[in-house]
């Protein structure tokens, strides 16, 4: 990240795993969004975007209606800037990725991407983020 990018985030204390794998945690000053950077000496670069989903059933909740799981699939149908079904996987394949993937658990949904080298992940991150934050969500998504 550039110095300008770092100015948008607050760095938290670093940690290490096994004395050799450094973990850096950053938090957006504007949104509170947290990101972790784990650097390893491997040829693959993995991206995991994890969003909290409703885990409680109460008077105002959706009572297990499957909405988080439906949205998990719907984001792959396009976004505001990239309104094309399957464009993420097509672009990911250009970065020697095995496509994109996601899963929904009780309390979170995780979107993943693994590419050969960091350049692919960095190039796809804004496109993936647009799909996650601004999906097109047309009626056809729910039929």
Predicted features along the sequence, with ranges:
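His/Glu-rich zincin catalytic helix
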Residues: 1-88, 112, 126
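Active-site-adjacent, His/Asp/Glu-enriched structural segments that form or flank metal-binding
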Residues: 64, 73-143
